[in-house]
Amino acid sequence: MAHQAHAYHMVDPSPWPLTGAVAALLLTSGLAMWFHFGSMILLTLGLITMVLTMIQWWRDVIREGTFQGHHTPPVQKGLRYGMILFITSEVFFFIGFFWAFYNSSLAPTYELGECWPPTGITPLNPFEVPLLNTAVLLASGVTVTWAHHSIMHGDRKEAIQSLTLTILLGLYFTALQAMEYYEAPFTIADGVYGSTFFVATGFHGLHVIIGSLFLSVCLLRQIQYHFTSKHHFGFEAAWYWHFVDVVWLFLYVSIYWWGS
């Protein structure tokens, strides 16, 4: 291999973006097939493809960044910019849902009874499960910051403990949200209230699941001594977790508290 006289990472050709795209197509098509025809074949195939893609893509990135040293300071700087742009795109993604909610709730039409929540909808009590969920997510924000500071100070044991606690809080939040959905007195088919509620909180819940998965990989890497006090970009991408926290606060204030 020729000597590389610059600090930038020339990425090798990779099949994982393509297999990831195929998995995404299978998942979305599979969901439609499952909803309308009760068949889970495509959905299962999509899930298997997605899991295999994620495992092998993570393996490649860990090898390049940790063992081959390709993630030099300029490369890490580029990755940070990429993460900031990704989170910015996610902000606009959620702005769309808030826009739909406020557009419907600030000027409810006569079909909704000219009131909000619409006639016939019994909203959830914001001071029960939603308030507990808020406390759980805020606590997870504290523990993930604790984990970050532990890694920066080289305190391996505390980093593992706090990261484990963060993941458990994320899973607890997901379980509470699933229970809330199961017991909700309205469904996604109940007009604009049901659709905006379930789409906004559902996509947020999906982000919590993805974040928990990424933090689990960070935990495994921390256990295997991959992170140092100076080189731990994989964990710094936990900015995503703080973003999920902030989105939930807006959801809680807008949809659960004000919207009820």
Curated annotation (Swiss-Prot):
Topology with respect to the bilayer: Multi-pass membrane protein
Enzyme class: translocase
Originating gene: mt-co3
Pfam families, per database record: COX3
Annotated GO MF terms: cytochrome-c oxidase activity
Topological domain spans for side Mitochondrial intermembrane: 35-40, 106-128, 184-190, 256-260
Biological process, per Gene Ontology: mitochondrial electron transport, cytochrome c to oxygen
Organism name: Xenopus laevis
Sequence similarity: Belongs to the cytochrome c oxidase subunit 3 family.
Record-linked PROSITE patterns: COX3 (PS50253)
Family matches, as CDD domains: Cyt_c_Oxidase_III (cd01665)
Subcellular location: Mitochondrion inner membrane
Keyword line: Membrane, Mitochondrion, Mitochondrion inner membrane, Translocase, Transmembrane, Transmembrane helix
Full protein name: Cytochrome c oxidase subunit 3
